[in-house]
Swiss-Prot record:
It comes from Phaseolus vulgaris. GO terms for cellular component: chloroplast thylakoid lumen; chloroplast thylakoid membrane. This is Plastocyanin. It is a peripheral membrane protein. Participates in electron transfer between P700 and the cytochrome b6-f complex in photosystem I. Transmembrane segments: none annotated. Residues 1-99 form the Plastocyanin-like domain. It is found in: Plastid, Chloroplast thylakoid membrane.
């Protein structure tokens, strides 16, 4: 599944922002605009026993150019909240449910 970081009109959003995937499916987060973005999973809003650091980009690492990607595979079923740390305050947040 591909998730765009930034909409076509330049909005600071994930597209889609809420989605479901089967356990073990690769999620490809792809920078869609020229803004620096990243993908950080909220340690308080992921399934118990999952290490947020292992599935998140380091907060100082950014996808700067259009087309740059970050790939993650989630195996533990449940709901995961994530955000872009530079743009979290602007509402750039998302949620994935692993079935």
């Amino acid at each position: 599944l591909e998730v765009l970081l930034g909409s076509g009109d330049g909005s600071l959003v994930f597209v889609p922002s809420e989605f479901s995937v089967p356990s073990g499916e690769k999620i490809v987060f792809k920078n869609n605009a020229g803004f620096p973005h990243n993908v950080v999973f909220d340690e308080d809003e992921i399934p118990a026993g999952v290490d947020a650091v292992k599935i998140s980009m380091p907060e100082e690492e950014l996808l700067n150019a259009p087309g740059e990607t970050y790939v993650v595979t989630l195996d533990t079923k449940g709901t995961y909240s994530f955000y872009c740390s530079p743009h979290q305050g602007a509402g750039m947040v998302g949620k994935v449910t692993v079935n």
